[in-house]
Amino acid sequence: MSNNNPKKRPLDAISNTFEVKQEEPEFSSDGFNTTNDDLMSLMTFLDNGTGQQNQQNQQNQQPQPQPQPQPQLPQPQSQQPIYNSNTTTVTVKTEGIATSPLSNASSPISTNNNINNNTNNNNNNNNNNNNNNNNNNNNNNNINTATPPAIGVQQNSNIPYSYPIYTDVTGQQTQHQQNIGQNSVNIDPYFQTIDGAQIQQQQLLQQQLQPIQQVNNPQIDQAQIQQQQAQQIQQQQAQIQAQQAQIQQQQLEQQHLQQQQFQFQQQQQQQQQQQQQQQQQQQQQQQQQQQQQQQQHHQQQQQQQQHQQQQQHQQQQQHQQHQQQQHQQHQQIHQNHQNQLNHQNQLNNQNQLNNQNQLNNQNQLNHQNQLNQPTQPQMQQIELPILHQLPVEPQHLHPIPTHINNNGNNNNNNNNNGSNSSNSSNGIGSPDDIIEPNILSSIQHCNNNNLPLPDHLLINTPYGNVLQPHQQIINECLKLHLAQKEQLDKMKIVQKQVLAHPQKETFQMLDNEQNTLKKQIDAEITSLQQIDQTFVLSPPEIRNVIFLLHELTIQSIQLELYHEELQLLVRPQNPPPTIAALVVIEQPFPMVITKCKPLEDDPVVVQLLCGTRTELQMIGKVRATMIVENQQGSKTSSSPKTIETEVVSMDETNRLAKYHLKFLNGTRKNPVTLKFGMQVQVVGGTAVNIESPPTSPFIVITNECQYEESDGTLLKKDSFGNNNEIPWASYANKLQRHFLRATRQDFMKPTRYLSRHELMYIHHQFFGSKPMIPQSSFDSFWIWFGKGLQKLRYQRHVCSMWQSGLIYGFISRQSVEEALRNEEQGTFLIRFSERHAGHFAVGYKVDDPDPEKRIRHYLVKADDTAGAKKTLPDFLSECPQFTKILQLTIDVSTGEPRLRNFPKDVVLEPYYSKRETLPATNGYDSLPTIL
């Protein structure tokens, strides 16, 4: 072609920096070289826009291969090729290569993808499998990665023309592919449009711009395709082998994990076994330690016992000194107490005079007001409740403090008087409604005996003949009880008048008096309970405390009935309630009763209490019901008839019912109580059943052998109740009470009760001298004490000998040896054995060269007192070695025990059996067996 073509432009217009590097063709050249005609054809094609039509014609001439599914590869966001800043790639069209199967294979980057578009169906299937395997491998193992498409190349098999690849000066291969005839054409930013005039100038650079010769050699293509297929098959096999290896590796890992888990479980089992063995060893060690601790505790107890014995000896010496000091303190306290009484009497007398003057002035004012005003019927005063007349609602019963302050009571009285004087001008009431001032002043005068409780109430001192603080309080409570009884009788008269003709002044005063008296009674009950729990009392003191607690409780019930009746003026009820109560005022319980034996000397007395104006009609008689107490709770006895006389008539005058009980059946060692009930009716009302509180517990036995266990059950219930532990003083007082009943002694004049030394012996021997007695220690004590009490009650002459002091009773072996150490030969002493419950032991003195063997002890056996006609005195009389007996007496001045020796026949002769004396058997010694 000539260089005179007007469309050719010189290549000098191209930038001088454009470097062209001729790239060697990948395949051998077939003699085809790119010419200027080819470039002209390309430019003509671009200018005429017929490239698309020619492309379609060429596609119609060539057989269309059946399209195969191609794997979807991620397309880059930008179709622009990436160029080096120093180079520019120029792509041209080469005719005859656009439809060649190797037209896209000239690029090394897109070789694999172009081959897939030109192979047959089998090759396509293999390639698809390969791509699928590659995708699976990419998803699961991340081993193989699909070859990304070439930068700037669109993977579209329908594009008929493609530009060959040129190589820039850097040696990098780039490919620019675009659809001819489309609206948008990707143009290199450095590419300049070449027209026909410039084609001749481009010939100068043909030698440098040698395109890659693409040879359409079927043999080379087929060999290359087979080689690529073989490589793909190898890759697939390698991938399959890799997957199999991975699966095997996973299986091995799972097996390894299972083995580790199995080993871990075995280790855990071994650890558990080791822990169990360690626990067993620890338990064995703990058991050994407990045994050692028990042994040490036993040794410590023995040491403590020895130490306590020494302390007791020292305490006895200190006690004498302490008594002397207390005697002086008691005298001072008594003087202070008398001074307080005198001062209080003076204050009360002054208050009484002031109250009388105020009442007289008030009565005069009321009388003048009533004369000036017309009289009104009395019923009009009751139509409106007093609540509307009073400025303040009356006081109710409040919790009771332990101490009573007389000054507070006097202030209340003064306040009441002030209210009366202030309200006297209202003109309420009439001359007939005025209460006599003497009655009100007498009620107030009864409160003059209110005494504050002394601060030394909690001092724990043993009882004696010296007047002690708790004895003073008991005496004061006795005086208050008599004064309160008189006060209740006068209060009944006043309340009748108040209910008949209500006045707010007298109502307020009477309500305050009832509240004050209720507080005083509760304070007395509290102080007596504290005395019982703090001091070891003598039998007369025990009797007084029991009597006062019972009487004060009845007074409290009567006062509550009065108060309830008085409050009906403020809170009327329709129909009016039945204000009545049934109480037991006398009872011999707690005690053990023998079946079918009447209680002639110890009757049970029941009294009916009511209000001041309550008119009751007694319907029927009083009925006694036995309530059995067991572990399941209280329930009525199922026996058809357990009491011989269950129903008794009540005296209408005194409203008393007296029972001489006789029980026909035993209670099977279970404690029981009695309740009494009857029907009463208010005039104009309906009948109402009222019932008394239960009596103290008792047990009915059928044989004397049941006494020991039954009395122990009663003592335990009477002492502890629902408590796990109680003070020693309270327990000693309950024990003394049961002991006196068992030995049939009078509380006020006992002949031989448990002395202070005997109680100290019991406290130390069985309870370790602890201030609090646990309920768990009771059974072991009663096993020993109960058998001795059984013998004292039922064995012939034993109880009489006890009361006469011929049986010392509760004393240790060491104390017996000390008592006999300075006595003559043949002197003996009777006591209860410490190791053999219910047996007597005789300690006596003999003539022995060894001083340690001169005091001996003999245990009285059952055969020694066997038979109806052989008693303990008879056994002692038959022993010639027993000549003198030590008799126990109590010093009246100090309360200390004293022993005096008497010839046994002098003191025991009244107890000897009257029978013929048999001659002694010759050749045999009657000396008792030496222990």
From Swiss-Prot:
Cellular component annotations (GO), alphabetically ordered: cytoplasm; cytosol; nucleus
Residue ranges flagged as DNA-binding region: 662-706
Polar residues: bias regions: 100-110
Bias (Pro residues) ranges: 64-74
UniProt keyword terms in alphabetical order: Coiled coil, Cytoplasm, DNA-binding, Nucleus, Phosphoprotein, SH2 domain, Transcription, Transcription regulation
Residue segments, region Disordered: 1-83, 98-151, 304-340, 396-430
Biased segments, Low complexity type: 52-63, 111-144, 404-430
Any one GO MF annotation of this record: RNA polymerase II cis-regulatory region sequence-specific DNA binding
Annotated spans, Mediates nuclear export: 504-554
InterPro entries linked: EF-hand_12, p53-like_TF_DNA-bd_sf, RHD_DNA_bind_dom_sf, SH2, SH2_dom_sf, STAT, STAT_TF_coiled-coil, STAT_TF_homologue_coiled-coil
Coiled-coil zones: 471-577
Inactivation phenotype: Cells display abnormal regulation of gene expression and aberrant timing of development. Colonies growing on a bacterial lawn are smaller, have a rough edge and are surrounded by satellite fruiting bodies.
Assembly and oligomerization: Monomer, in the absence of tyrosine phosphorylation. Homodimer, or heterodimer with another family member, when tyrosine phosphorylated.
Protein family (similarity comment): Belongs to the transcription factor STAT family.
Protein name: Signal transducer and activator of transcription C
